[in-house]
């Protein structure tokens, strides 16, 4: 992302296009392609991937670092899609949730950590969540079935149990 004080407008717009197209537009287009199929099939399940920046561990504020403005905006957009779609699609038996994950061992985080000269010591890398842990949690969420939770941003954080929280009650929207 960009530094709103130091980076040029050109860099900011270029970074915006890249991150919003990847993080938000990708989720939007994939969801819009899948939703008609899910509705016509009698229901289904959408799991969006957001970030712990919008659903932080207890005791922490939302948002990433000082240079995370565009990344955070794109992930907040995913929150908006998750919330709106879950309300609209609930009557069609389509559940929509998001995982708001902390650092997960992946090619992306390894690349970013190296690019930005972040600590890659064994202790740090070992602390990252493993993909199989998230896959297990994903299956648990899916297996809740048609009556399972919808519209939830589920925080999954380092140094916390990797588990589903209690299901939240769906609140009515102020807007139709």
Question: What label would you give each PLM region?
Answer:
Residues 2-5, 60-63, 91, 101-128, ...:
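A glycine/serine/threonine-rich, flexible loop-to-helix segment
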Residues 79, 89-105, 148-154:
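Conserved Rossmann-fold SDR core element
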